[in-house]
């Protein structure tokens, strides 16, 4: 897109006159924009000039206010607000100056022209060092430029007649004068011209008004600007950013960065860099030999300063920037031999006397003017003028009476008095009152109410008579309207209006008196009949009025007759002008008879004259197209042949229409009947069910569950426990085996249901390596698995003999031994013999299992403890428990645990539970209600071990019945699969 900015502006941005004869320097604030941060810029479809985008009054923050939903090139009030306000990260403020040069043809006009107006090229987002990822935009020659920015100006001007404002350019330009919109050229557009004569704005000459200028460049590819101005713009004050009446927030300045008191209070050095305040870490560098610095938070740097030498009239200090002593002279000081003489009151300056001491003198303030009072204040001579004083050569003449002022005598050494109260006018009397001259008009009243009394400087008093005036007693009756003449009444004390009579005796005339000259007028009434004492006025000529003949006063109406004697015309009288018209009747046919006409109302049934013309005949219009797949009809005389959808036109006068495409209707071979043809939905597969869905004729193919394609027939499995497979010849065969659902777990019942294989666990069953073993709640008489032997189930009895004749030994139901003390019993002293040493052999279980059993014995897991047993105890079928092995990890007959010989973990003293070494491959040890049990490794319902519970404080793993358990449910989730839930107690 070719785009121009050719602006001829009569304005001053924010300016400073460098040379009042040659140039004007204009200060502007630019906000650099980029399409990647504000999508109001580089719009794909600019759209041209868009007036009315902003409100006619300037906003409270002196920027334009967007009118909502007015432009497709402005996305929202938020994006528009970023054009002329500081938004860190969205735009960048940049100060800019334009120099206007005085016109050579008109010295009151200054101008600036630039055919490549890119004021911030290489700056802001165009600086690739700081913003390397911002897009580059180029002109038609391929030269990169910064095309996206908004410029704003705020100033004041004193209006003078003849000021004008003219510009020619493109893109958004708004100018406000006195905060009112005077130039409205919004949008992205081509060149447009506007000129303003400020004389038409209703401004007061010499009065100061605010001037606000806003301009945005929002699109490629060219930029031109030409400015002219005759307006004298000024600014009351600039902020540190160079913005007229700004608040200093549009840029990084010394006040908000370098000299920010908060930085100094915390010993931080800050300076502006790329319009961003960069701060250092807190520090107070030493500046010896003058100072040593210490940082005190919220106070700043504290320094110890040296004392510098000085003379009598000098102040000395150590410069912290140069680290050197510097001296400055003391104002109004004279160095005398005996010390400094400092003048504190300049009206009495101090000086040295001959002895080197200070003496005071007086300042001479005489201005040799006799009309001033001369005084001295703070060393400055003040000459106060004496009111009403004339300065003569040798004296001052002061006037005390303004009617008789004092003036200088001819010699200038004395005063004379003047007389001023005489205006030399005939019509005034002259007086002097309280020192002021009074000139009072003379009284010319002739006591005549019908005269106007005035005074003429040449003639004196003049008495001019009033027209149409009658002098009454103490008042004048003046007639201003001769249609209502004023006369004296009530013995001359009152004026009364008497209307003028203008009746001409004609009932058909409108009589009136014309003010103010009193002329009678008689207007003849239109369409009026004079009936003597009254009139009859016709308002509607289709019903004229006439005088009655019965002696009454009621007018008679006679309707006007309109008839052209034609049967096919409509005769009417038009009110109120009474004109007769004859309108032809549409669709009417005149017959042979003179007054006979036939009117057609329905063109599908036209009306015609009879053969002899004495009557009308109704006929019918034929619309048959002889197509049996159309519906023939006549509407308002128009034939319609609507095509019947999905219809086949047969040969013998019928049409076959299909309403359901699952059953299509076609013509029979003879063409006189329709026949039905079903839609073929067969997909050629045996394991699908075909269905046609009407009326659209959509074929669906539903897969038959558990069906496989065989050569001869489809094979459908109705019972998952009896699957059907393809035979060698393509026929169906049943494929049933006994081991289909066997999970190789002796403690489960394996069944096949409609859902497939189901496995139900037997309660109280332990899965041994060679069959199952059902346990009992009686832990004193226990069934367990022989993991180290034949892997079958065997029975054990817990012995609780403590070899103490004074105790009664009990095996509790919980599996604990209880020794009841007997009364009146004495325990004999035993002979102390060391326990025999049992040395493990190579035939015992590995060191990670039972380390306590010698050859010929095996380890059993009883109540969670490993214990050593021999094969039998002499024929009763119950293994006999033996002593353990010596060492720190085994028990002995005299140990505190009763010499059970079970394995203990080093340093813990806790009985070792069953672990992975006691369960075959694919199984793991779980403890259910205190009883160890090998279960499948993926058995998710039981996952706590006694060892885990013991680490929680000597607890044991138990299972409780799960209330959420759902038996025989295929695809159970979470804990609904588990009949028991593990818990530590």
Swiss-Prot record:
Task: Tell me the protein's name.
Answer: Protein psiQ
Q: What start and end residues bound the annotated signal peptide?
A: 1-20
Keywords attached to this Swiss-Prot or TrEMBL record, sorted alphabetically, are:
Glycoprotein, Secreted, Signal
Residues with an annotated glycan are: 127, 309, 424, 491, 517, 527, 592, 620, 649, 696, 735, 767, 786, 824, 842
InterPro entries attached to this UniProt entry: Fibro_Slime, PA14/GLEYA, PA14_dom, Prespore-cell_inducing_factor, S_mold_repeat
* PANTHER family named in the record: PA14 DOMAIN-CONTAINING PROTEIN, PROTEIN PSIB-RELATED-RELATED
> Which GO cellular component terms, listed alphabetically, does the Swiss-Prot or TrEMBL entry include?
extracellular region
Family, as annotated: Belongs to the prespore-cell-inducing factor family.
Q: Does the keyword Glycoprotein apply?
A: yes
Keyword RNA-binding tagged: no
PROSITE patterns cross-referenced by the UniProt entry: PA14 (PS51820)
Subcellular location as annotated: Secreted
Which species?
Dictyostelium discoideum (Social amoeba)
Q: Which NCBIfam families match?
A: Fibro_Slime (TIGR02148)
- PA14 domain segment(s): 102-247
Instruction: Write the gene name.
Output: psiQ
């Amino acid at each position: 897109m070719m785009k121009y900015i050719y602006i001829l502006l009569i304005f001053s941005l924010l300016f400073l006159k460098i040379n009042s004869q040659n140039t004007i320097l204009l200060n502007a604030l630019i906000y650099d924009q980029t399409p990647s941060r504000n999508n109001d810029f580089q719009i794909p479809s600019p759209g041209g000039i868009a007036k009315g985008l902003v409100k006619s009054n300037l906003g409270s923050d002196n920027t334009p206010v967007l009118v909502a939903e007015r432009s497709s090139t402005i996305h929202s009030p938020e994006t528009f607000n970023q054009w002329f306000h500081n938004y860190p990260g969205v735009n960048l403020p940049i100060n800019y100056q334009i120099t206007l040069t005085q016109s050579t043809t008109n010295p009151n006009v200054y101008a600036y022209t630039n055919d490549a107006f890119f004021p911030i090229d290489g700056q802001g987002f165009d600086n690739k060092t700081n913003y390397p990822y911002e897009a580059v935009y180029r002109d038609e020659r391929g030269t990169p430029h910064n095309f996206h920015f908004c410029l704003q100006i705020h100033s004041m001007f004193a209006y003078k007649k003849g000021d004008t404002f003219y510009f020619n350019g493109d893109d958004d330009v708004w100018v406000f004068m006195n905060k009112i919109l005077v130039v409205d050229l919004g949008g992205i557009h081509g060149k447009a011209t506007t000129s303003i004569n400020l004389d038409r704005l209703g401004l007061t000459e010499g009065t100061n008004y605010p001037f606000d200028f806003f301009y945005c460049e929002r699109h490629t590819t060219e930029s031109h600007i030409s400015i002219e101005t005759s307006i004298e713009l000024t600014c009351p004050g600039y902020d540190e950013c160079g913005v007229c009446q700004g608040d200093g927030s549009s840029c990084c300045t010394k006040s908000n960065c370098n000299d920010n008191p908060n930085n100094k209070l915390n010993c931080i050095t800050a300076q502006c860099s790329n319009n961003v305040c960069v701060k250092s870490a807190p520090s107070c560098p030493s500046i010896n030999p003058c100072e040593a610095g210490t940082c005190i938070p919220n106070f700043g740097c504290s320094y110890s300063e040296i004392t510098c030498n000085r003379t009598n009239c000098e102040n000395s200090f150590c410069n912290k920037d140069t680290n050197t002593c510097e001296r400055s002279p003391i104002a109004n000081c004279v160095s005398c031999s005996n010390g400094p003489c400092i003048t504190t009151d300049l009206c009495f300056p101090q000086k040295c006397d001959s002895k080197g001491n200070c003496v005071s003198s007086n300042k001479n303030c005489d201005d040799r003017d006799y009309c001033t009072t001369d005084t001295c204040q703070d060393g400055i001579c003040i000459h106060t003028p004496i009111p009403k004083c004339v300065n003569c050569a040798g004296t001052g003449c002061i006037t005390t009476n303004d009617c008789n002022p004092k003036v200088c005598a001819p010699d200038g050494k004395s005063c004379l008095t003047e007389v001023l109260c005489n205006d030399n006018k005939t019509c005034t009397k002259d007086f002097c009152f309280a020192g002021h001259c009074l000139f009072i008009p003379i009284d010319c009243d002739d006591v005549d109410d019908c005269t106007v009394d005035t005074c003429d400087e040449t003639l004196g008093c003049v008495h001019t008579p009033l027209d149409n005036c009658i002098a009454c007693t103490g008042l004048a009756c003046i007639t201003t309207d001769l249609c209502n003449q004023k006369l004296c009444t009530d013995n001359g004390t009152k004026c009364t209006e008497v209307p003028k009579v203008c009746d001409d005796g004609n009932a058909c005339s409108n009589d009136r008196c014309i003010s103010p000259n009193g002329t009678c007028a008689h207007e003849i009434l239109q369409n009026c009949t004079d009936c003597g004492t009254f009139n009859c006025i016709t308002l509607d000529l289709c019903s004229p009025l006439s005088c009655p003949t019965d002696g009454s006063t009621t007018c008679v109406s006679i309707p006007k007759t309109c008839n052209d004697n034609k049967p096919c015309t409509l005769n009417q009288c038009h009110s109120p002008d009474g004109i007769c018209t004859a309108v032809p009747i549409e669709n009417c046919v005149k017959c042979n008879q003179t007054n006979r006409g036939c009117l057609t109302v329905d063109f599908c049934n036209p009306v015609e004259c009879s053969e002899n013309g004495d009557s009308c005949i109704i006929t019918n219009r034929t619309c048959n197209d002889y197509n049996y797949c159309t519906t023939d009809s006549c509407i308002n005389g128009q034939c319609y042949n609507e095509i019947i959808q999905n219809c086949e036109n047969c040969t013998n006068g019928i049409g076959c229409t299909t309403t359901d495409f699952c059953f299509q209707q076609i013509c029979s071979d003879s063409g006189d009947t329709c026949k039905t043809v079903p839609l073929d939905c067969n997909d050629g597969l045996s394991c699908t069910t075909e269905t046609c869905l009407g009326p659209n004729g959509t074929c669906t193919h539903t897969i038959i569950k558990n069906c496989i394609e065989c050569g001869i027939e489809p094979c459908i499995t109705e019972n998952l426990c009896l699957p059907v497979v393809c035979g060698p010849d393509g026929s169906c065969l049943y494929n049933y085996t006994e081991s289909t659902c066997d999970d190789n777990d002796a403690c489960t019942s394996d069944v096949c249901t409609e859902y497939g294989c189901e496995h139900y666990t037997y309660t109280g069953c332990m899965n041994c390596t060679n069959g199952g073993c059902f346990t009992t709640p009686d832990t004193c008489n226990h069934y367990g698995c022989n993991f180290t032997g034949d892997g079958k189930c065997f029975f054990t009895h817990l012995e609780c003999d403590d070899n103490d004749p004074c105790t009664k030994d009990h095996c509790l139901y919980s599996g604990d031994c209880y020794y009841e003390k007997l009364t009146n019993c004495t325990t004999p002293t035993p002979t102390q013999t060391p326990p025999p040493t049992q040395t493990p052999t190579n035939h015992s279980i590995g060191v990670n299992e039972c380390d306590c059993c010698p050859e010929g014995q095996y380890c059993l897991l009883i109540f969670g403890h490993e214990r050593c047993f021999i094969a039998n105890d002499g024929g009763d079928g119950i293994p006999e428990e033996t002593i353990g092995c010596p060492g720190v990890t085994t028990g002995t007959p005299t140990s505190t645990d009763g010499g059970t010989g079970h394995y203990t973990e080093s340093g813990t003293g806790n009985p070792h539970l069953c672990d992975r070494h006691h369960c075959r491959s694919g199984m793991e040890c779980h403890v259910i209600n205190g009883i160890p049990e090998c279960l499948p490794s993926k058995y998710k319902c039981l996952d706590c071990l006694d060892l885990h519970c013991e680490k929680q404080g000597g607890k044991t793993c138990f299972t409780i019945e799960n209330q959420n358990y759902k038996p025989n449910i295929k695809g159970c989730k979470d804990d609904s699969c588990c009949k028991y839930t593990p818990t530590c107690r």
